[in-house]
Amino acid sequence: MLRAMSSTYPLPSLPTVLVLASGRGERFAASGGRVHKLQALLGDKTVLQHTLDNVRASGLPWHLEDVGHPGMGDSIAAAVRATANADGWLVLPGDLPLILTETLHQVAQALQQHPVVVPVFQTQEGRLRGHPVGFARGCREALLALKGNQGAAPVLRTFGATELIVNDVGTVTDIDTLQDLERASALLAGRQA
């Protein structure tokens, strides 16, 4: 059963944020997690609730893709199919609870001039590519053709990707293990201090 949860933001020229929440979370379970990673508590809310709250606060249209699919490519294709009239898409895995609304706006704005936009966060170890990855409407057919576990990598190869430097550790703070959850908890506490 598909549960399409979309905002009612009135401007159709904005891209739609696709929140992907259909993965199995096997690495989290293997690390000792007792619930699905998206249902794990981070402070007083679940990981997914943090992500959705940040997306809602952005004011951008959004869609939650939470039906089980064989791979991330299948999830992206299903979400694009469900929002086929969108003016573009920001693909955001549901396990990125610290994403800033400002970053969502920056990626959306960059899509006005580039077909594919990837946020990049600078660390001491180097530059890390993160999410959400933005896709302009011209990428629609390529996104609809995605299958399997490689996500949108084929679309990035076809269209190229413009890297957008952002000051948002939330773009690279995904929750795959209990250790990731602990790290996110410390980062969240630092933001709230």
Please give the residue ranges for each predicted region.
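Nucleotide and nucleotide-moiety/phosphate-recognizing core
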Residues: 9-129, 160-168
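Short aromatic/basic micro-patch
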Residues: 41, 98, 134, 174-175
